[in-house]
Amino acid sequence: MAKINRRTSGVTGYLAVVSLIAGTLLAGTQVSSCQTEKELRGLPNFGRVTENLYRGGQSTSDGFSALHAMGVGMVVNLREDRAEIATEKREVESLGMKSVGIPWSANHKPSSAQIVEFLDLVRANPNTKIFVHCRRGADRTGVMIAAYRIAVEHKPVAEAVTEMHRYHYDWLFRPQLKRYIESLPGLLQNDPQFADYHPQPSSVR
């Protein structure tokens, strides 16, 4: 009986250690989740693209304040409502950030000029944290980020499209956006507006 008790005691001790480790890991996860929820308040569908490039949906006032606290220096608005753009511009600039509008409708594919304008902004401000958004942070924002992945980072189209879906791209009602991204490598090769982004021989696969 004593042996059984010692064995039971050993098992109990082992389970206690495992339980303690699991509890510690779980607590760490919970703290991390709380921190993330706090950081993302007012920033729907938020994500980090690179060290200095962020994406998301339409921010609230709290969200813009959070972006400012994160060190973001430029907000790029892809929404097409001129009044909303003007209102956001005042709010963003009151916090000391620069506001840039590249308006277009998610019901249509973007023009080459609009894509180039965004890519040029990012390239011209390598040390500035930039936040780009539309209404949901999914369709127009998804296209801009996919274009960045392909034109600047030379990522495969499939990888860029997968990222679009991860941020809730509306593939059912806006299939033209995916088709545009699938056509982008050809545009980079042949459209003069993308002259600065023509792929180098080493990046052509």
Labelled PLM ranges:
Residues 2-130, 143-205:
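Cys-dependent protein tyrosine phosphatase-like superfamily
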Residues 137:
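Substrate/cofactor-recognition hotspot
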Residues 134:
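Short cysteine clusters
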Residues 140:
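Glycine/aspartate-rich loop-and-adjacent alpha/beta segment that forms the canonical ThDP
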